[in-house]
C-alpha cells in the first residue's frame, strides 16, 4: 500500500496509522464472508467497517411519490434511511478529522469499485469537500473508468437533493447531471472532474 501510494500519487503514508477497510458490499457479494473472516483472524492488521449499500430504485427525475417527502424520509433508498449516508458519512468524517491519535486511512470499496463506491465517495465529497454534483459524478466516472450505475447515480442525485433541502445552494443540477438506462448504465452530463488525478484536498468542515 505504501509503494502504491507513492508510485501512483507521490504520497508518503505516515509511519503509524489506523487502517480501516470500509466495505460497502452486501452478503450476496462474492468474497463478503471471506473478507470478514480475514479481519476476524487478523485484528492487529486493521479493522473492518461494514456499510452494506444498496442505492436507489427511485429515478430522481421521475420518482414514484412526492420528491420532497422522499427526501425528508430518506425512503428514496432501497433500504430506506437515505441509504444510511448521514450517519456513515459523519462517522468517516469524524475519524478523518480526529487528531487525538494516529491518522486514519480508509480503504473504501464495493465489488467493482464504481457503483456503491461512487455513491459513497460522491456523497462524502458533496457533503464535506465542497464538490457540486457534476464534479462528484465526474470524479466517480473518471476514477473508475465508467460512470456509476442506475442505483448509485440516482442515490447521488437524491443525496444532492437532500443537501439542497438542508440549505445548500451550491450543489448544482441535482436532477440533470446524468442520464441512465432503466436499471442499467449511466452517462454524465457536463461532468466537471478535477484536473488532478490525485486530488489533495482539505477534509472540509
Residue ranges and their predicted role:
Residues 1-112, 119-205:
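Cys-dependent protein tyrosine phosphatase-like superfamily
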Amino acid at each position: 500500500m505504501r509503494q502504491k501510494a507513492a508510485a501512483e500519487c507521490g504520497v508518503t503514508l505516515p509511519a503509524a496509522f489506523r487502517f480501516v477497510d470500509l466495505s460497502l458490499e452486501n452478503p450476496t457479494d462474492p468474497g463478503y464472508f471471506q473478507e470478514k473472516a480475514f479481519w476476524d483472524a487478523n485484528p492487529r492488521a486493521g479493522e473492518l467497517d461494514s456499510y452494506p449499500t444498496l442505492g436507489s430504485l427511485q429515478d430522481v427525475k421521475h420518482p414514484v411519490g412526492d420528491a420532497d417527502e422522499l427526501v425528508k424520509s430518506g425512503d428514496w433508498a432501497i433500504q430506506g434511511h437515505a441509504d444510511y449516508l448521514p450517519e456513515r458519512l459523519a462517522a468517516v468524517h469524524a475519524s478523518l478529522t480526529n487528531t487525538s491519535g494516529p491518522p486514519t486511512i480508509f480503504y473504501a470499496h464495493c465489488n467493482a469499485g464504481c457503483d456503491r463506491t461512487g455513491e459513497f465517495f460522491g456523497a462524502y465529497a458533496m457533503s464535506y469537500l465542497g464538490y457540486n454534483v457534476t464534479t462528484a459524478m465526474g470524479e466517480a466516472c473518471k476514477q473508475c473508468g465508467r460512470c456509476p450505475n442506475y442505483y448509485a447515480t440516482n442515490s447521488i442525485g437524491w443525496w444532492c437533493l437532500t443537501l439542497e433541502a438542508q440549505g445548500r445552494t451550491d450543489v448544482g443540477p441535482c436532477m440533470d447531471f446524468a442520464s441512465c438506462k432503466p436499471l442499467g448504465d449511466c452517462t454524465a452530463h457536463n461532468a466537471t472532474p478535477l484536473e488532478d488525478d490525485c486530488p489533495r484536498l482539505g477534509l472540509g468542515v
